[in-house]
């Protein structure tokens, strides 16, 4: 896979609630028993280095043995506070795989991709966390390659026909599977987002306005 040209960083900070001093604690109590995840900040940086807001993203989580939890976790920013289904760290280490944008249709640690939408899909590699080391910094990489065309002023769009637009990306294995369905992709920005790797020759059409 081509090396990503930019990245977005999501910092996850895990905090442990403070137990009330009510005389209920015992010698077997430990901080890990109450460890839960919280997110302190989430920022995205564009090509120009400027920060962009990210209102939501998705996460898949694995247990200590590497087994995938069934939940496709949606993370939302509500009035400046990140909210999502609670994830406990008391039962062992966890592996985190984050992606953007969130989609409820994703399952099994896989992202369904469609190049016709020209969505800037982002993914992360695995980050391990535990009750003893609960803080994680996650880097999201661009999954698609950005190809920019220098066009005359009269050209308002770039179009590629007969392109294999459908694909699946496994966050757990890092493998990209391009499917045989073909169609037309286009963009009015002078750039196209394409799947990385070797591709057959493509016919690029410049569309005048």
Go through each PLM region and give its residues.
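Short, low-hydrophobicity acidic/polar segments
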Residues: 24-165, 181, 188-209
């Amino acid at each position: 896979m081509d090396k990503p040209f930019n990245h977005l960083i999501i910092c996850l900070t895990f905090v442990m609630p403070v137990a009330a001093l009510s005389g209920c604690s015992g010698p077997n109590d430990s901080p890990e028993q109450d460890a839960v995840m919280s997110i302190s900040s989430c920022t995205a940086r564009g090509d120009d280095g400027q920060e962009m807001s990210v209102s939501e993203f998705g996460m898949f989580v694995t247990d200590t043995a590497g087994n995938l939890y069934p939940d496709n976790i949606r993370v939302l920013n509500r009035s400046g506070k990140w909210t999502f289904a609670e994830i406990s760290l008391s039962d062992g280490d966890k592996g985190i795989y984050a992606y953007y944008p969130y989609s409820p249709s994703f399952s099994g640690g896989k992202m369904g991709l469609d190049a016709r939408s020209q969505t800037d899909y982002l993914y992360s590699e695995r980050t391990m966390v535990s009750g003893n080391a609960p803080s994680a910094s996650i880097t999201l990489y661009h999954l698609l390659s950005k190809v920019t065309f220098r066009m005359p002023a009269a050209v308002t769009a770039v179009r590629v026909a007969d392109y294999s637009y459908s694909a699946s990306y496994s966050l757990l294995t890092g493998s990209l599977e391009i499917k045989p369905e073909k169609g037309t992709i286009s963009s009015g920005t002078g750039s196209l987002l394409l799947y990385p790797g070797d591709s057959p020759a493509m016919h690029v059409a410049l569309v005048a306005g």
